[in-house]
């Protein structure tokens, strides 16, 4: 009798064990970061990338002035994208793009002269250490190495005018070389400080501004189509007569916000 009771108890315990789900089955799948969730609203993505705790106080200090540009750029970037951030400086936009592309990657480019003159090395190295999906490119605008895979997006943030200040620069040739590294259907997102209509490139090295008509002409000649010409960064109060670093207008200049697409 005792042996029968022991046998029954053993069987009951065994069945009870079989009925319990394993701890692995109980563990829920980890949710993606808010900026990486499928179909996440733009506001959610922007708030999430700005909230990253590894961003410096210097970067955060620019968030208010650059919010409209950030929203404009991130509206055209998605998780998994491979992005070139051209003339990236210390990496304000590169950090935001790094979070926004999630499993994608960002090539953060600067000419060596910029890195040396503006003493960017420490900030760039810190960014690359904090964000494994950011790769530093230190090369001239006309010598950007061909990526292993074509870019989904090329971002040229308020520095296109600077490319005209490089000796021997051929803007259209540079644009064509960049577009060769962009996948068919890929986007070029460009913002820059506007000068008075008809000024062409006369103020690129003095006021650090460029005529929007010049930019449109350059990229048309390079073979891309304009798909968006937004006024999101417009400021009618800017008289276009001041250098963009003037304290009265810095961060509030009248800027173009353009999106070009490489044909399929």
Per-segment meaning from a language model:
Residues 170-184:
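A short glycine-rich, Lys/Arg-flanked "PGG" loop and its adjoining helix->strand segment in the class I
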Residues 144-154:
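A short acidic, Gly/Pro-enriched loop at the edge of an enzyme's catalytic core
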Residues 80-89:
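Conserved class I S-adenosyl-L-methionine
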Residues 91-95:
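Glycine-rich SAM-binding Motif I of class I
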Residues 41-78:
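Class I SAM-dependent methyltransferase Rossmann-like catalytic core
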Residues 237-264:
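Core SAM-dependent methyltransferase catalytic element
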Residues 78, 101-102, 182-184:
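Helix-to-beta-strand junctions that scaffold the AdoMet/dcAdoMet cofactor pocket
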Residues 185-193:
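Conserved beta-strand signature within the Rossmann-like core of class I S-adenosyl-L-methionine
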């Amino acid at each position: 009798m005792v042996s029968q009771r022991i046998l029954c108890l053993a069987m009951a315990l065994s069945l009870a064990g079989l009925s319990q789900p394993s701890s692995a089955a109980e563990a829920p799948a980890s949710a993606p970061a808010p900026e990486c969730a499928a179909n996440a609203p733009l506001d959610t993505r922007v708030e999430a990338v700005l909230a990253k705790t590894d961003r410096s106080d210097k970067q955060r200090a620019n968030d208010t002035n650059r919010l409209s540009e950030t929203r404009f750029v991130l509206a055209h970037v998605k998780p998994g994208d491979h992005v070139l951030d051209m003339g990236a400086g210390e990496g304000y936009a590169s950090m935001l793009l790094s979070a926004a592309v999630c499993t994608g990657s960002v090539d953060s480019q600067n000419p060596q002269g910029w890195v040396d003159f503006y003493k960017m090395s420490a900030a760039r190295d810190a960014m690359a250490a904090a964000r494994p999906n950011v790769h530093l490119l230190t090369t001239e605008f006309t010598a950007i190495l061909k990526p292993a895979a074509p870019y989904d997006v090329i971002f040229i943030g308020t520095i296109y005018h600077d490319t005209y200040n490089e000796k021997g620069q051929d803007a259209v040739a540079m644009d064509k070389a960049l577009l060769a590294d962009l996948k068919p259907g890929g986007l070029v997102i460009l913002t820059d400080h506007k000068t008075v209509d008809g000024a062409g490139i006369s103020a690129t090295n003095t006021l650090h501004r460029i005529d929007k008509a010049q930019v449109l002409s350059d990229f048309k000649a390079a073979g891309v189509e304009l798909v968006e010409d937004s006024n999101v960064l417009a400021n009618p109060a800017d008289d276009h007569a001041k250098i963009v670093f003037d304290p009265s207008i810095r961060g509030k200049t009248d800027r173009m916000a353009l999106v070009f697409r490489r044909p399929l």
